[in-house]
Amino acid sequence: MTKLAQWLWGLAILGSTWAALTTGALGLELPLSCQEVLWPLPAYLLVSAGCYALGTVGYRVATFHDCEDAARELQSQIQEARADLARRGLRF
Amino acid sequence: MATGTDQVVGLGLVAVSLIIFTYYTAWVILLPFIDSQHVIHKYFLPRAYAVAIPLAAGLLLLLFVGLFITYVMLKSERVTKKTQ
């Protein structure tokens, strides 16, 4: 089974479980506070997934190792290459 | 470690995501179990907004993505038309 099929199966199973529980189709009598938590659950999972993604991106940006020497070396190499190509006649 | 603005922006994103996550968790998960007379309910909107606001934000995001794609496509079309 492909990854897409797996994901769709998982979503379908979780979605139908949630729908069955919120519409009361299973005939369970959940306490009112549990029902109150249950019905926004898909929105909650989406928002927490978004927050996790945002936080991970921010954390990786903050802890990315800069290489000052390599950056300077690269910039000087770029200047060198531009001068060389301009001398050979390439117009930027 | 990253330096300067990178660190500030990165940690800012982490802080924003944590704030949103804790507020939203308290709103959706914790509030139904707290007695409705408690003063903390004053700090949260009615529960219907817990789904309406992320939904509206998601639609806005889709709108901006669509507008950006349209803009880029129109610009590239104009560039190819100019070089023809």
From Swiss-Prot, chain A:
Pathway: Protein modification; protein glycosylation. The chain crosses the membrane at residues 8-28, 37-57. One of its GO terms (biological process) is protein glycosylation. Keywords: Endoplasmic reticulum, Membrane, Transmembrane, Transmembrane helix. GO terms for cellular component: dolichol-phosphate-mannose synthase complex; endoplasmic reticulum membrane. InterPro entries: DPM3. Belongs to the DPM3 family. Component of the dolichol-phosphate mannose (DPM) synthase complex composed of DPM1, DPM2 and DPM3; within the complex, associates with DPM1 via its C-terminal domain and with DPM2 via its N-terminal portion. This interaction stabilizes DPM1 protein. Stabilizer subunit of the dolichol-phosphate mannose (DPM) synthase complex; tethers catalytic subunit DPM1 to the endoplasmic reticulum. This is Dolichol-phosphate mannosyltransferase subunit 3.
